[in-house]
Amino acid sequence: PIPRTLAITLHGDMDLCIIDEMPMNRKPITTKVVGEERLTRVYDFIKKEVQSGKQCMIVYPLIEETEKSDLIAAKEMYNDLSAKQFSNLNVGLIHGKMSKIDKDQIMYDFSNNKIGVLISTTVIEVGIDVPNSTIMLIEHAERFGLTQLHQLRGRVGRGSDKSYCILVRRNFSENSKKRLQIM
């Protein structure tokens, strides 16, 4: 359970219900932690999966790059990935500064497999159920909390196909490595 839910349960404000098995026909999600040097191989894997009819979500911590931060942003990577690595795939972009109408249209297109690769911020953390989406790639994973990473990972693995959550770490500190390996 996530820390907030555990605290509420322990302090008597919520009943405890143990779910000890996965929904029917679902497989466990394979979670991998990789360094940025392996991204070319990861992108090749994504291309292969999307070309076979599956879908992928790629999450970035920022909408736009800033001078104060060395983090990679969703808008810039949307432009880069859709022009280079995924130029032959349908790539979409969604983030919190978009209008509700635009976000709804992007999610409708993604849900109906018109978009193979969805570049996003954490706006997709909850409420997304696309069984055909089998890959979640999270950039700068060390910058997210474990609860957030768990929520994001939960966006894949909702169908009967094997699913993957790939955590890209760009901070190679031992502490961030250990924290991500908990996932």
Q: Where are the predicted features?
A:
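Inter-lobe coupling/hinge segments of SF2-like helicase ATPases
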Residues: 1-182
